Amino acid sequence: MAPTIQTQAQREDGHRPNSHRTLPERSGVVCRVKYCNSLPDIPFDPKFITYPFDQNRFVQYKATSLEKQHKHDLLTEPDLGVTIDLINPDTYRIDPNVLLDPADEKLLEEEIQAPTSSKRSQQHAKVVPWMRKTEYISTEFNRYGISNEKPEVKIGVSVKQQFTEEEIYKDRDSQITAIEKTFEDAQKSISQHYSKPRVTPVEVMPVFPDFKMWINPCAQVIFDSDPAPKDTSGAAALEMMSQAMIRGMMDEEGNQFVAYFLPVEETLKKRKRDQEEEMDYAPDDVYDYKIAREYNWNVKNKASKGYEENYFFIFREGDGVYYNELETRVRLSKRRAKAGVQSGTNALLVVKHRDMNEKELEAQEARKAQLENHEPEEEEEEEMETEEKEAGGSDEEQEKGSSSEKEGSEDEHSGSESEREEGDRDEASDKSGSGEDESSEDEARAARDKEEIFGSDADSEDDADSDDEDRGQAQGGSDNDSDSGSNGGGQRSRSHSRSASPFPSGSEHSAQEDGSEAAASDSSEADSDSD
């Protein structure tokens, strides 16, 4: 860059006062102003003032009544663009011999793959596994070989196989034959495993529903880790966990959790004594349990979304195999301890057994009725009605007979009619009861699960009076058998809590059936059979 030279004249011009070289400021007023004083400054800061009027009042458009009432002309063609000839039917007839446009013929041609006979074209699809791939993004050559089969060929193959493998029962006769076939297949002897030909059965036992223990609802309790105490192991730990109990509790902050209780040494001795004496419990004894762990709980039952049915099997020597339903699944995860705060929960659970009340007996009878009662279908009901009508017509014909036969048959007809009325009443009561059970089944099950985990108001009142006890002692193990009979004609049951057994197959609640109720059910069955 060339140097800049400043002359003396330029220096003098630079040191001249500004008043000589500044021009007067132009006024914003067109006319000549007499006084040239400028306006004074604003004495206060600017402020935002709210605009009190609607901003859309000058731009908003509202149609008048004349514009609303005016009917605009709709200018369309008379055929609305659809040319339909109703007189000449040959108008829309397609000529099969018409020549297609060359562009359309090209679209309708089938794709014919030219034979690749040249040696160079055969090497294009060859994949060499030891050679480095030059394409890092494409996933086309990730396999050792390229399938030349078209994907269009395999469309619908899985659906076709599904239809061939599964039998679709479209009518009632095919359903009946399929059901009868299941009974025939059950009579066939099992000679080998269905998928392992070399595996042969050692013993074959029939599988039946557990009518004896079905009245007791069972739950599967799943722990995230082994709940056994650290200081015990082996048979002692299994014995302690088989007598364990879970109970819902609430801390000082109002948070709910599940407490895992283990029996104390004195309780273990009492349970061992009861087992040796072949009795469930001593009526006057009190069993103590101490808290061992705290868990967060997650319950799923039939009312929950995505529930899967679960069953467990009970093997009884010389009797067979029985299955029962696990209608509730409880997942327990360890409760996190607060930072810097040591858990000070030192609870003691006191259990004393009592007889079952009417509400619990009714719940057991309802579960038993779900397993035993059979609701007839519409066709069966119609057949029963026709049979009753025919029986009524035969009664009228018999009444027209001789007086001696009439006198002899009156007692029989009156007895059969009374039995029919009783049977109809029993069926009506069973239907109404089953309908009510189905409608309130979900709500009752959810309430029962909450009551069994966190207790009920009746239990809290009984604990306050120290007269009643907890309802439920769980027995763990899928093959654990609890056969009990009535002692002294009274009913006694274990408590109502869910099982805290570590075995995944579930728990059994032992309960004793009443002989008088069994006799009543047998008499009602006899009445229905007499119909």
From Swiss-Prot:
Keyword tRNA-binding recorded:
no
The coiled-coil regions, if any, are: 352-400
Which parts of the sequence carry Phosphoserine? S117, S456
For region Interaction with PINT87aa, the annotated ranges are: 150-300
- Gene Ontology CC: Cdc73/Paf1 complex; cytoplasm; fibrillar center; intracellular membrane-bounded organelle; membrane; nucleoplasm
- Biased composition range(s): Low complexity: 476-485, 498-507
Q: What does this protein do?
A: Component of the PAF1 complex (PAF1C) which has multiple functions during transcription by RNA polymerase II and is implicated in regulation of development and maintenance of embryonic stem cell pluripotency. PAF1C associates with RNA polymerase II through interaction with POLR2A CTD non-phosphorylated and 'Ser-2'- and 'Ser-5'-phosphorylated forms and is involved in transcriptional elongation, acting both independently and synergistically with TCEA1 and in cooperation with the DSIF complex and HTATSF1. PAF1C is required for transcription of Hox and Wnt target genes.
What is the recorded name of this protein? RNA polymerase II-associated factor 1 homolog
Q: Which organism is it from?
A: Homo sapiens
